[in-house]
Regions:
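Beta-sheet ligand-binding and adhesion/scaffold domains
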Residues: 64-66, 93-166
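Hydrophobic membrane-insertion alpha-helices, especially the h-region
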Residues: 6-16
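Tryptophan-anchored aromatic micro-motifs
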Residues: 28-52
Length: 166
């Protein structure tokens, strides 16, 4: 009887050892390698009959963002250009995200690289405006990034519609 008990105990130990050595195969994590495109557009008629137009296209891939922003006021020179930067996770308070980008803008025949913050979510987007200062290398940054004023609210649209509005 003692022999059988020892034999069962040895078999259980060997079985436990073999089972613990099994390799766990994890499924590979597949990252989305195709960007998500979001587009926004606004047109606001001024008292003089001229319209302020703004449109935005963003391509999101993880926490990176690229795109184009065009701000075309009715009575001032337009400011247009491409950008790239990072995008935050969803802020549960505002139910939106913030893109912090470097905008290569063109206005009045001059090209300037400047900081641009864009909030978006819940079907709209707004660009942040505030006093800008040269950080010493020709790149402009917000003097007080916590005191921005957000401009015209752009509504989400199909990206093909934005291209038609150019």
């Amino acid at each position: 009887m003692k022999k059988y008990l020892v034999l069962v105990l040895v078999v259980l130990i060997i079985l436990g050892y073999v089972l613990s050595k099994k390799e766990t195969v994890l499924a590979p994590v597949v990252e989305n390698s195709k960007p998500i495109s979001l587009c926004f557009y606004a047109q606001k008629l001024g008292v003089n009959g001229l319209s302020d137009v703004a449109w935005l296209k963003m391509n999101l891939l993880g926490d990176k963002v690229t795109g184009e922003f065009r701000n075309i006021p009715g009575e001032k020179d337009k400011k247009v250009g491409t950008f790239e930067g990072t995008v935050s996770k969803v802020d549960p308070y505002m139910m939106g995200r913030t893109a912090d980008v470097w905008w290569n803008s063109m206005a009045e025949g001059m090209q300037v690289k400047e900081q641009l913050k864009i909030t978006f979510g819940e079907g709209n987007a707004q660009a942040g405006y505030g006093e800008m200062v040269d950080r010493g290398d020709g790149v402009y940054v917000y003097k007080n990034p916590d005191q921005l004023t957000y401009g015209i609210s752009m509504t989400d649209v199909a990206c093909d519609d934005v291209r038609l509005a150019e």
